[in-house]
Amino acid sequence: MLRVCAASEEEPYSVKDGSGFENKIAEALAAAMDRKAVFKWYNKPAIYLVRDQLSLKLCDVIVGLDSGDQRVLTSMPYYRAPYVFVQRKDSKLSIKDWNSPDLVKANKIGFVPGTPAQTMMEKTGLFNVHFNYMHSLTDFQDRRNKYTRISPRRVMGEVANGTADLAVMFAPEVARYVKANGELTMTVIPDDNVGVDGARIPHHFDQSFGVRADDRDLRDAIDAAIPKARADIEAILAAEAIPQLSLPKQPVRGPRS
């Protein structure tokens, strides 16, 4: 048995009916370990899984953490994914990177606060311009002392219907909706960005499984199983239309936000 920590309403990552792509990845991993995936569902956002579930030993592994996440012990990375620009296919704006002149022409830009997107929006002087629109994506809910998730489905819907000209999102979070819509396109953002202080702002991130910091035996067993599960994992990601980047020899460490 492999006890998997899982959020019950974190589409497209994890859904209680098992349709989340990370639910499928967990099952592929468990099969490669000759175990059965048993999901321990949690009705709060996934950002609380480490604190409220894994650390309390209510489950044993989390799918889809940034490699090197210091709250846990992470496995070898099993894929690498980018932040992307999402536009309508018929958009007249040509936006390929953060230096694209057409960025300033975008009517509304959707993004998630606390991510590389916000850092670069601040650098380019666009954060305040699109601040109110960002908060409209949660219907202006008060974010003080609580976490309010911006729905990736909603963000993609607003780009598709023309409310927004552009979204800057983590590809795994939106690829499903881009694929399903047919009128949207993703552009991988290059991983060569720096902030106002010259510090590097990563836009491509290795993804790993996470276990408790003292659970080295399980981490090692997962590492041994990843090569066996790799073909199945890559097929799941391909079906989701998530861009799969080459894993570097020295994986990038550190969280997205």
Predicted features and spans:
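Extracytoplasmic small-molecule ligand-binding "clamshell" domains
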Residues: 1-71, 146-149, 239-240
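Short loop->beta-strand "edge-of-pocket" segments that line small-molecule binding or catalytic clefts
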Residues: 2-8, 12, 98-128
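Solvent-exposed coil/turn segments that connect beta secondary-structure elements
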Residues: 7-10, 66-69, 80-81, 88-91, ...
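Periplasmic-binding protein-like
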Residues: 7-8, 80-92, 139-141, 179-226, ...
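Extended ligand-binding regions for polar small-molecule ligands
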Residues: 20-33, 89-93, 98-117, 196-244
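Ligand-binding cleft/hinge of the Venus flytrap
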Residues: 26-36, 40, 80, 117-149, ...
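Sec-exported extracytoplasmic/periplasmic mature domains
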Residues: 30-38, 55, 59, 90, ...
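A ligand-binding cleft/hinge motif common to bilobed small-molecule-binding domains
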Residues: 48-49, 55, 63-73, 123, ...
